[in-house]
């Protein structure tokens, strides 16, 4: 049986997710009520039977470190682990200068473990994937590198590495985030084939390429720009079509679902994907569960049923986490993390509320993301007047209001 190792790159700053990333790394941003974004890639690896994982961290990693340490305890008796790897400056007093450099500075981990194949996956996407199927594809083609890819609309090409393949699935072209005239898919001028940022290397080839790149002073030391763009011209580089990946318990509708949640709008929409009656991505797949930390919080509670003055505690088309209290309020098409209290006569619509938030009486909140430890005074209105909201909060062009972690909101705002 082949020896496998997963290197999970979780060190990105996540600037486009500001202010949600002011105090945490992007993979540590809460998602779906009770998860962190990093849980999806780690769950995919665990469900695939790949149980040796190194999580490479760097920027604002305290929240991420705490979460991984509490949630991801595999058994050392069977040499299974999920271990954090901070920037160690093994090659000099410098931070990681790119995703490829993050691997170069930690090559000792790979050479010590001596895996036959090494997965290098990002930690900031939402999806389900059986990585063993990608491994079988890689082995069948005797590839040096296999890149997982997904079709995207041509208008989004500037955000991704765009791939060109031949009839056998071998990479024959690659441009990182093209600014014009992206290569479209054969027979479909409306879509491009985009790299998912998930790579599978034959380990010998990975070490050779990482060392070669580290010795190039002109390199950006980035997997897309530097490794893939160079390697496909010299080595056996193939492209794995993510749409072919079949996960147990997955509906046909969910197949191929993959979201880059690197911007506020994309993050918001991916969360909203979860709350539909028939969601395009379901958290309720017992055959391929998403694992996370388990806290000893009490069940969610819904109180008051006074129809006369509309003081009814209820939630519709929503995800309500443990420890929440909906006290005579209405929550609709929203996601609440643990220990959120929504008080009487308040309404919360199409919003994402992080842990330990208190929403006062008679508040009206719509299309908002509220970070942790925020107390919203009674009668506060958010999301109905964007000009007014912009004076106090961050508002995206699409009208999503973001309230930063721990923000103090004055009564009567």
Curated annotation (Swiss-Prot):
Catalytic activities: alpha-D-glucose 1-phosphate + ATP + H(+) = ADP-alpha-D-glucose + diphosphate
Entry EC number(s): 2.7.7.27
SUPFAM superfamilies per UniProt: Nucleotide-diphospho-sugar transferases, Trimeric LpxA-like enzymes
Pathway entry: Glycan biosynthesis; glycogen biosynthesis
Gene3D superfamilies: Hexapeptide repeat proteins, Spore Coat Polysaccharide Biosynthesis Protein SpsA, Chain A
Binding of alpha-D-glucose 1-phosphate, residues: 161, 176-177, 195
Domain of life of the native organism: Bacteria
Top-tier EC class: transferase
GO molecular function terms attached to this record: ATP binding; glucose-1-phosphate adenylyltransferase activity
Keywords: ATP-binding, Carbohydrate metabolism, Glycogen biosynthesis, Glycogen metabolism, Nucleotide-binding, Nucleotidyltransferase, Transferase
InterPro entries with a match to the protein in the record: ADP-Glc_PPase (IPR011831), ADP_Glu_pyroP_CS (IPR005836), GlgC_bac (IPR023049), GlmU/GlgC-like_hexapep (IPR056818), NTP_transferase_dom (IPR005835), Nucleotide-diphossugar_trans (IPR029044), Trimer_LpxA-like_sf (IPR011004)
A single GO BP: glycogen biosynthetic process
Function, in words: Involved in the biosynthesis of ADP-glucose, a building block required for the elongation reactions to produce glycogen. Catalyzes the reaction between ATP and alpha-D-glucose 1-phosphate (G1P) to produce pyrophosphate and ADP-Glc.
Homology family: Belongs to the bacterial/plant glucose-1-phosphate adenylyltransferase family.
Subunit description: Homotetramer.
Protein name: Glucose-1-phosphate adenylyltransferase
């Amino acid at each position: 049986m082949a020896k496998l190792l997963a290197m999970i790159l979780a060190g990105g700053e996540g600037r486009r997710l500001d202010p949600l990333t002011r105090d945490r790394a992007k993979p540590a941003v809460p998602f779906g009520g009770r998860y962190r974004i990093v849980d999806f890639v780690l769950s995919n690896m665990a469900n695939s039977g790949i149980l040796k994982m190194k999580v490479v961290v760097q920027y604002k990693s305290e929240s991420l470190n705490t979460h991984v340490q509490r949630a991801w305890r595999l058994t050392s008796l069977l040499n299974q682990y999920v271990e954090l790897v901070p920037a160690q400056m093994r090659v000099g007093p410098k931070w990681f200068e790119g995703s490829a450099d993050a691997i170069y500075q930690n090559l000792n981990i790979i050479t010590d473990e001596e895996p036959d194949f090494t997965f290098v996956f990002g930690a900031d996407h939402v999806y389900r994937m059986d990585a063993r199927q990608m491994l079988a594809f890689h082995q069948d083609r005797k590839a040096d590198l296999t890149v997982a890819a997904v079709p995207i609309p041509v208008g989004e090409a500037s955000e991704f590495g765009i791939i060109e393949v031949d009839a056998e699935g071998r990479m024959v072209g690659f441009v990182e985030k093209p600014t014009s005239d992206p290569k479209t898919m054969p027979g479909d001028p409306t879509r491009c084939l985009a790299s998912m940022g998930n790579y599978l290397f034959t380990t010998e080839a990975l070490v050779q390429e990482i060392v070669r790149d580290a010795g190039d002073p002109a390199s950006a030391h980035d997997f897309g720009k530097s490794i893939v763009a160079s390697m496909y011209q010299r080595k056996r580089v193939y492209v794995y079509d993510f749409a072919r990946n079949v996960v147990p318990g997955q509906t046909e509708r969910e197949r191929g679902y993959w979201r880059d949640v690197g911007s506020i709008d994309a993050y918001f929409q991916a969360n909203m994907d979860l709350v539909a009656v028939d969601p395009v991505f379901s958290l309720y797949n017992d055959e391929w569960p998403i694992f996370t930390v388990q806290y000893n919080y009490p069940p969610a509670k819904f109180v008051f049923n006074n129809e006369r003055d509309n003081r009814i505690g209820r939630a519709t088309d929503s995800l309500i986490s443990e420890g929440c209290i909906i006290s005579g309020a209405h929550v609709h098409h929203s996601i609440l993390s643990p220990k959120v209290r929504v008080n009487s006569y308040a309404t919360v619509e199409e919003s994402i509320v992080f842990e330990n938030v208190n929403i006062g009486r008679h508040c009206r909140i719509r299309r908002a993301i509220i970070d942790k430890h925020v107390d919203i005074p009674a009668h506060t209105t958010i999301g109905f007047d964007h000009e007014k909201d912009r004076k106090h909060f961050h508002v995206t062009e699409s009208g999503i209001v973001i309230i930063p972690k721990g923000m103090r909101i004055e009564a009567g705002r």
